[in-house]
A protein has these predicted regions:
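Active-site-proximal loop/helix segments of hydrolase catalytic cores
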Residues: 171-243
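Pre-active-site segment of Zn-dependent metallo-hydrolases
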Residues: 54-98, 105-110, 203-218
């Protein structure tokens, strides 16, 4: 296991300029050809992101619905493990936190063992859960990158293949009852062509997000995945519009009751949401380098 305790100094060139403050819906629809950038919904907060041939997974391996949230459909779970399209050639897994509707050790370990070139990025709590399930001497743990970050700590970063990764700790929503859960916000640039961000179950606290403004501004985010309640909360909306300032946002963590009712949920929330496993969204106007086409 690789452990990040003291983040290295940030060396990210400022590229944020001229972005409109609003949050724009991502356009989905039939394509004449495979889009250069696309997000595919697994279920709950699980998303596959593909940009110019580079693929990553957020919160994809979990086993608990808590009686409220959708599980990844069996067929998709099988396709993930087998590496069948669109789940082929994945480079990395990202885990926001240890709750069972975002992460379970057994399916994550099964995937890592099936795909020996894939790395997993998460908190120390995630790494500890994997080590407990696998045994501390299991070689698979060498591909687990653990970030030891407290809220208020400097962001950390990492590079893996064509991925440029940075991560910051934002507390889990729910106040004191969730204070023992480490929630990480990952921002990942793929092939230097597009950048996505996953908020996990971050609290919609404007002061906390404003205190990280230099971090949010350090790179332009093309698509952010907030928990859907950010759209239903005035503070959450202001965070997306004034702090994150991504080109587009698609809410996740939508209850299973929304399956088949997406239009109604989107209308009620006033923003775009992933509601049905298998849904896709095109990510912006991406130009791939010739070698990645």
């Amino acid at each position: 296991m690789v452990k990040y305790r003291t983040p290295a100094p940030q060396n990210i060139r400022l590229t944020f300029a001229g972005l409109a403050a609003g949050v724009f819906a991502v356009v989905s629809g039939a394509q004449a050809h495979e889009p250069a950038g696309e997000a595919t919904y697994l279920a709950n907060a699980g998303v596959l992101v593909s940009v110019c041939g580079e693929k990553i997974l957020f919160d994809a391996f979990y086993e608990d619905s808590y009686g409220r949230y959708a599980l990844v459909p069996d067929e998709a779970r099988q396709d993930l493990l087998a590496g069948r399209p669109p789940y082929d050639e994945v480079s990395a897994l990202f885990v926001s936190h240890v709750h069972g509707d975002h992460f379970s050790p057994a399916p994550a370990l099964a995937y890592l063992r099936a795909w020996p070139d894939v790395k997993l990025y998460g908190s120390l709590q995630v790494a500890d859960a994997l080590a407990k399930a696998a045994g501390s001497d299991d070689e698979v743990l060498q591909r687990v990158i653990a970030f030891d970050l407290e809220p208020g700590a400097a962001p950390a970063d990492a590079v893996h293949d064509a991925l440029s990764i940075d991560v910051v700790a934002i507390p889990h929503s729910g106040g004191a009852r969730m204070s023992d859960i480490d929630n990480l916000v990952f921002r990942v640039s793929l092939n230097q062509a597009a950048t996505v961000m996953h908020l996990g179950d971050a609290v919609a606290d404007e002061a906390l997000f404003a205190g990280r403004q230099a971090h949010w501004d350090a790179r332009r985010t093309d698509l952010v995945f907030p928990p859907f309640w950010f759209f239903r909360d005035d503070a959450g909306r202001r965070i997306l519009e004034n702090n994150i300032r991504a080109a587009a946002a698609v809410g996740v963590h939508v209850p299973a009751a929304a399956i088949g009712q997406g239009d109604g949920w989107r209308d009620e929330s006033g923003g775009d949401l992933f509601t049905d496993p298998g849904e896709t969204r095109v990510i912006g106007d991406i130009v791939c380098a010739a070698e990645n086409r």
